[in-house]
Regions:
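Extended, charged low-complexity segments
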Residues: 230-300
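Charged/polar, solvent-exposed surface patches and flexible loops
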Residues: 25, 92, 96, 286
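Aromatic/basic-lined ligand-recognition segments
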Residues: 120-239
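Secondary-structure junction/capping motif
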Residues: 16-22, 116, 243, 253
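Short, intrinsically disordered low-complexity segments
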Residues: 22-80, 84, 225-233, 238, ...
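Internal, hydrophobic cores of structured domains that mediate oligomerization or house catalytic pockets
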Residues: 35-36, 41-43, 65-168
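Short, extreme N-terminal segment that most often corresponds to the first beta-strand
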Residues: 1-45, 140-164, 292-300
Length: 300
């Protein structure tokens, strides 16, 4: 579910072209573009589209589509549920675009009505209340095997305690605090490299863990956001030493890798991911040695 605003410049000639970096700077936003796993690639844009977020209160991201800017047409949207701060940011972005374009009309696709910038600002409390109700309904839905939200920087799988708490919450304070806290960390959010065998067509997921870098890894090799429903049959991990510009010998079975991490102060990140503390070269070499003694290793 989303709130989508179509913005059209009214003047017939000399359409104003807005660029993503300038809009981000004017509103105090950061921006990037999602990869295939809904992990944000910072400071990138694709075909005039990007995801905006405010670094001081990171939510689910505001999608901007300026692919038809030469026609004086733009679209911005936010996902529901989202945080009150992000709704405020959305209204600010709409106001900035309206100001840059001069005379413009704004139309909400979902509500099938026009809005002015002032109406958006005045409606923030109502929009936030609807978002909170949507969060309640989302968390109360027992048909979901898991509750996953795409956030501004990466996906988030709700833990059982958050699902329970947000199913009956009366405000968005903890929701906003949690989403920002998860995304404000300076971490590497692991993404797999998917390879398919020519003979069996089986798909393998390959991950890389680097030294001295706090990292978020899925508990299972297939634990990435997979809207294409690809069937991953096996997973492997490789250790990379950036300081020496080389990888340690071997690729190790993913399940064994996760089991061996139990002694390294690993913590839960969300229901499907763990937070691995920065590991030194010596620790990676030692871990590789343990895994090298197990079965199923493949040579790199």
């Amino acid at each position: 579910m989303a709130f989508t605003l179509q913005i059209r410049q009214k003047k017939l000639f000399g359409k104003t072209t807005l660029d993503i970096p300038s809009l981000a700077q004017a509103c105090g936003f950061c921006y990037g573009s999602n990869n295939d796993f809904y992990i944000l690639q910072e400071n990138e844009q694709v075909g005039g589209t990007a995801v905006f977020y405010h670094p001081e209160h990171i939510g689910r991201g505001i999608f901007f589509d300026g692919s038809k800017s030469r026609e004086g047409y733009y679209e911005i949207s936010y996902n529901i549920p989202t945080t009150k701060s992000e709704i405020t940011d959305f209204a600010r972005l709409a106001g900035e675009i309206e100001s840059c374009l001069g005379r413009a009309e704004m139309y909400c696709v979902e509500e099938e009505r026009a809005f002015t910038g002032r109406e958006l600002e005045q409606g923030i409390e109502d929009f936030a209340a609807f978002s909170r109700k949507s969060l309640n309904q989302f968390c109360q839905n027992k048909e979901f095997r898991s509750h996953i939200l795409t956030l501004a920087r990466w996906p988030y799988t709700l833990t059982e305690d958050k699902t329970t708490a947000w199913g009956t919450c009366t405000d968005l304070f903890d929701f906003e605090r949690t989403l920002h806290g998860l995304q404000a960390r300076d971490v590497y959010y692991a993404k797999p490299r998917l390879l398919q065998k020519n003979d069996t067509k089986e798909i393998g997921a390959f991950y890389a863990l680097t030294e001295e870098c706090e990292s978020v890894f899925p508990v299972r090799a297939d634990g990435f956001l997979n809207l294409s429903e690809l069937k991953v049959t096996e997973g492997f991990v490789q250790f990379v030493l950036y300081s020496e510009q080389r990888a340690l010998e071997g690729m190790f079975p993913y399940g064994q890798f996760i089991e061996e991490l139990s002694g390294y102060d690993v913590r839960q990140f969300d229901a499907d991911h763990i937070l691995i503390p920065p590991m030194t070269k010596a620790e990676l070499v030692k871990l590789a040695g343990k895994l090298r003694g197990g079965e199923g290793m493949i040579q790199s």
